[in-house]
Swiss-Prot record:
It is an enzyme of class 4 (lyase). Its EC number is 4.2.1.59. It comes from Pseudomonas aeruginosa (strain ATCC 15692 / DSM 22644 / CIP 104116 / JCM 14847 / LMG 12228 / 1C / PRS 101 / PAO1). Its main location: cytoplasm. This is 3-hydroxyacyl-[acyl-carrier-protein] dehydratase FabZ. The gene is fabZ. It is found in: Cytoplasm. The active site is at H49. GO terms for molecular function: (3R)-hydroxyacyl-[acyl-carrier-protein] dehydratase activity. PANTHER family: 3-HYDROXYACYL-[ACYL-CARRIER-PROTEIN] DEHYDRATASE. InterPro entries: FabA_FabZ (IPR013114), FabZ (IPR010084), HotDog_dom_sf (IPR029069). Involved in unsaturated fatty acids biosynthesis. Catalyzes the dehydration of short chain beta-hydroxyacyl-ACPs and long chain saturated and unsaturated beta-hydroxyacyl-ACPs.
Length: 146
C-alpha cells in the first residue's frame, strides 16, 4: 500500500532512524494501519546490543510502533511533514514486552487510533513477529505545527 518512497513523504525520519519499511494496510475509515520493519543483522544498533546475542532494543520497537502511528495520524489529517505538521512521541501507557526481536525477523507494526484531545493523539499499538506478540502499548503523540 505504501512503499519506502511514500513513507519518506510522511515521516521526517531518515537512516538509521527510519523504522518502517512498508505499509501493507491502511484503513482510514477504520482508523488503523499495519506496517512492517525488516530487521537485518546490519542494523547499527546490533554492534552494541548485544554483539554476542543481538536483540533489537525495546525502545526502538516502541519507536517503530510510534512511527507507524504517526503515518496513520498524518493520513487521517491528510497532511505531511512538508505541510508544517509533526508528531512528537511524548509517552506510552500499558507498555509490555513479550519476546525479543532478532536479526532476520520481520517486525509487524499495528496501530489503531483511540482519541485526540488538544493535539494529543492516542493510539493502541502492538508489534508481532510470526504472529506472536512482541510488544504492546498505548502510544501518545503531540501534534505540532511548525
Amino acid at each position: 500500500m505504501m512503499d519506502i518512497n511514500e513513507i519518506r513523504e510522511y515521516l521526517p525520519h531518515r537512516y538509521p532512524f527510519l523504522l518502517v519499511d512498508r505499509v501493507v494496510e491502511l484503513d482510514i475509515e477504520g482508523k488503523r494501519i499495519r506496517a512492517y520493519k525488516n530487521v537485518s543483522i546490519n542494523e547499527p544498533f546490533f554492534n552494541g546490543h548485544f554483539p554476542e546475542h543481538p536483540i533489537m532494543p525495546g525502545v526502538l520497537i516502541i519507536e517503530a510502533m510510534a512511527q507507524a502511528a504517526g503515518i496513520l495520524g498524518f493520513k487521517m489529517l491528510d497532511v505531511k511533514p512538508a505541510d508544517g505538521t509533526l508528531y512528537y512521541f511524548v509517552g506510552s501507557d500499558k507498555l509490555r514486552f513479550r519476546q525479543p526481536v532478532l536479526p532476520g525477523d520481520q517486525l509487524q507494526l499495528h496501530a489503531k487510533f483511540i482519541s485526540v484531545k488538544r493535539s494529543i493523539w492516542k493510539f493502541d499499538c502492538h508489534a508481532t513477529v510470526d504472529d506472536k506478540p512482541v510488544c504492546s502499548a498505548e502510544i501518545i503523540c503531540a501534534e505540532r505545527k511548525l
